[in-house]
Amino acid sequence: MPRDGNEGMFTIPGFSQIQFEGFCRFIDQGLMEEFHKFPKIEDTDQEIEFQLFVERYQLVEPLIKERDAVYESLTYSSELYVPAGLIWKTGRDMQEQTIFIGNIPLMNSLGTFIVNGIYRIVINQILQSPGIYYRSELDHNGISVYTSTIISDWGGRSELEIDRKSRIWARVSRKQKISILVLSSAMGSNLREILDNVCYPEIFLSFLNDREKKKIGSKENAILEFYQQFACVGGDPVFSESLCKELQKKFFQQRCELGRIGRRNMNRRLNLDIPQSNTFLLPRDVLAAADHLIGMKFGMGTLDDMNHLKNKRIRSVADLLQDQFGLALVRLENAVRGTICGAIRHKLILTPQNLVSSTSLTTTYESFFGLHPLSQVLDRTNPLTQIVHGRKLSYLGPGGLTGRTASFRIRDIHPSHYGRICPIDTSEGINVGLIGSLAIHARIGHWGSIESPFYEVYQRSKETKMVFLSPSRDEYYTVATGNSLALNRGGIQEEQIVPARYRQEFLTIAWEQIHLRSIFPFQYFSIGASLIPFIEHNDANRALMSSNMQRQAVPLSRSEKCIVGTGLERQAALDSGVSAIAECEGKIIYTDTHKIVLSGHGDTISIPLVMYQRSNKNTCMHQNPQVRRGKCIKKGQILADGAATVGGELALGKNVLVAYMPWEGYNFEDAVLISERLVYEDIYTSFHIRKYEIQTHVTSQGPERITHEIPHLEAHLLRNLDRNGIVALGSWVETGDILVGKLTPQTANESSYAPEDRLLRAILGIQVSTAKETCLKLPIGGRGRVIDVRWIQKKGGSSYNPETIRVYISQKREIKVGDKVAGRHGNKGIISKILSRQDMPYLQDGTPVDMVFNPLGVPSRMNVGQIFECSLGLAGDLLDRHYRIAPFDERYEQEASRKLVFSELYEASKQTANPWVFEPEYPGKSRIFDGRTGDPFEQPVLIGKSYILKLIHQVDDKIHGRSSGHYALVTQQPLRGRAKQGGQRVGEMEVWALEGFGVAHILQEMLTYKSDHIRARQEVLGTTIIGGTIPTPEDAPESFRLLVRELRSLALELNHFLVSEKNFQINRKEA
């Protein structure tokens, strides 16, 4: 973290810095580490040798720009070239060529990757750190059993356990365990070396009988015994080299390779001094672990907390990319070996160029970014979402946990998370606690641990020094939870007793015993939680919901920054990359909606702007210039605001006038009543861009054609097509309109020919071919304005590279009934009614309220922060002020938040000469009037300005109706889901509700006639259209017939009888 020039000052690190540092570590170190593992490859006769001169590898600058990669659906990558040599040992001749290994995707300026035109991001993963861990469990007799677990770098586990007779066993599988002596002997130690390297040799000798002596008499016997137990092999196996190789591959490589981090942890836990370069498990490690285990049984040593962050490591983007690069080099090695053997067998001429194929590296990275669970499509709903996505930490993924097997203890908050992992920001549902978010000041250290910054405390000095502590060092210091605001000018704490943290406990101790102190009030939280004002007054569950819902906010057409904020809005907007920033000082010489031209230092720089770009959530990303021609600017100044930013600050919602009161039941159960002003003045209007695409292929009957001449369709549907058969820019299209006209050739049957076609074929022998229309049609709910059309042609032009046509349609969506809105305190609701302005409640100065919330939603949810924000926002609106509030201000003064709000309301009341703004009898509340009658309400009502967001959950994307459509083949019931034009499910609770009203006939229709009765549903549809009595069928519905068939498959015959309503005769019907 860079230090500022002023004493005691600090700067917040870039929120995308973790991604950048990880990728740079992969380029600077990871590539060379994997390259050095690439061996020299020889043929079977050892006459030809192939090797890579990895010190001279080159990464070429990308051939395309980021925007072009997105536009053309390409991968933003760099080509990797390595000099390679082919040596003929007989003639001592060498041929050297620079060969192309493959493409490595590059990280862009947002900290993401562009793969096939899609923004993707790699999530950091939390894994159990390799090393050794001791724990204690109770057996069925209630006696403590001590075990140690050795975790390898590959994730494999081996256990040592001590029984009641103080015998030590190594458990190599769930069922099999072997003596520690056999394991040590199989690893290369004899009995004398074992006894010399342990602290309790008498315990090892206590269970050394004749049988054990025979097992460890030689290394070969020990290996055979170990293999027999490990592989569960019966009989008497014979020692051989293949047996050793199999044991080496299945056990020692997967369970004994500690890696760099594991070796460090093993040395620190067992007080060893084995060199860091020795990354494999040694007999000395096993014996030291056994000694420590014996000490545990005798009450010496401490057990390990597996959930402590010192026992976790972060698997960052550098580690994941390095693993994939190593996998690609292994595949390349196998391919080169096979090519050399094949070339020698067929006596072909060998060169380094024809030995190496670039497909190994390229396909490895393509499959990684496309299929790996930790490689995800970047969520770009708004600028905040982009940053937060890159700072996620996941326990899930390969080598990690699963949502169904993770225990509650793993999901819970741990004291070591303090200042490193946010205790609030996590996902909801089955993955709660398994997907977290980094705290804003946390960074990933060299050893894969999460480090947090603190200030050292000097009792008699003003000097401040910042240190980064890993979780393992954290326990040795007392850390004051106060920050720099709690210190006076002399640097000495005014209060003698301060709250502090020591060894995972929160205490109150004297200031003289403090070693470190926190640096920032938001140090413990993630970015999402740090944007919530008055977060200390909210329940943690509601703060969690708010952190998640801010990421779902839709960028509005006219953004507005919040009156009450936290101060991190500018940093979040800056690091998101949605704003255009001046890279150097200069003068603006030209500006329009497409670009800004800047002249500085003798050069002219053209800065392109983002114009109506679609995100993967269909939101609109757009940049608006904020500078005029002729204006002089400085480096770092905002040139253009992006989506959901104003003046370089994050602006996700709108400041609207709200009231907390019931209104005719329209805000029952979190429903929200809004004014029509929000619709007519486009307060909550947003733009959404949808993408529709179609491809042309070469079929067996010929190539498909893009044309505007479609004989099968009406001219009205083709009205928007140009002469090429593609919809024209700026056209307004409705559901069912043709966006791209396409004909697919096909050969018709003889019977389908028209008479004149058969005559032509008989007389002239002309083969008549017909074409089927396969046009791109606008689906339901897609109406809007065409803003862009892209015709992408792949290079090469073969039939395997089809042409792609993409049409982008923009929709303008006002707020409407059914949309979801939310505040920043977890207060969410659905729009229930849009009321005219004259009917809305109004203030004493005649201003109508914009939104009406239910007051019962506050006390039970315990998110009181919205009350503080509401009242302070009203004062800020009247005084034309903006507030940036730090959390936990009550630590400096009792009731600090309340005093601030009331003082600002009182000042606003004085300056505006409106006594109703602050009334001492009920401060914060006011008498308001019913817009329908003009009478005042009985009780004073809380009114104020709140920052309300419009979320991505909109009614236009969810509402759906069906009159008829497709049915499932087996059950003959309607399909499920909006995408399939499915029906509405009548579930168990819906049936109960209908039963409660006694509507037997409606219930029968919904469950039988309209659903899965094949003949009756056709009659019901026709009767509903023309009117009349709905017919009552006399046979069973299809679901009942399906049940009968399934019972018959179980050899059960079910006879059923239907009673006729006409004559009450029993008629037997076959199913």
Swiss-Prot record:
Keyword field: Chloroplast, DNA-directed RNA polymerase, Nucleotidyltransferase, Plastid, Transcription, Transferase
An individual GO BP term: DNA-templated transcription
Keyword rRNA processing among UniProt keywords: no
GO cellular component, one term: mitochondrion
Keyword Ion transport annotated: no
Any Pfam family the entry gives: RNA_pol_Rpb2_2
Chain coiled-coil ranges: none
GO molecular function annotations of the record: DNA binding; DNA-directed RNA polymerase activity; ribonucleoside binding
EC numbers, comma separated: 2.7.7.6
Catalytic activity: RNA(n) + a ribonucleoside 5'-triphosphate = RNA(n+1) + diphosphate
Compartments it resides in: Plastid, Chloroplast
Cross-referenced NCBIfam families: PRK00405.1
Primary role: DNA-dependent RNA polymerase catalyzes the transcription of DNA into RNA using the four ribonucleoside triphosphates as substrates.
Family as reported in the entry's similarity comment: Belongs to the RNA polymerase beta chain family.
Subunit structure: In plastids the minimal PEP RNA polymerase catalytic core is composed of four subunits: alpha, beta, beta', and beta''. When a (nuclear-encoded) sigma factor is associated with the core the holoenzyme is formed, which can initiate transcription.
Name of this chain's protein: DNA-directed RNA polymerase subunit beta
Organism: Acorus calamus (Sweet flag)
Gene: rpoB
